[in-house]
């Protein structure tokens, strides 16, 4: 039963949280918020809710994340983000408006997964092509073309241990207590590499 639970957990992560569509949407959203914050800090006034504006105007670290900031953060929800994205579609900034349109229209970046690390040359050539086509810098093209990696570990002995109470009243970690190879393999960290880029560059 424990093995089935862990196997289901791994499959759930790959099929839901780490599915290419979910991952692509999350990565674009991160790029949108990064660009919005960058513009806000340069003095550009972007339409959004007060809680969202606060976090875009201020550089918050874990050290100064006090009760007041936590209260503001708790006021943020999907409505704040979606409303902002809808408004940002009409902004003059090419990067912010284009990425916002992608999310609203569900026209996401293409994402390619690989067991091997994506060569930097591959992303660089795509950046050059995209930058030239849209008359932007290669640094700005990095909002649309980027590499990274995702990790999935169905079971971590350190983070979320599952312990078995044996008949002799001793407690043992589930992987050590099991003689099944499948269970041991589920505790291994699986890493996949990705590259995101606009579909028209295929």
How would you label these PLM feature ranges?
Residues 1-202:
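Histidine-centered, transition-metal-coordinating active-site segments
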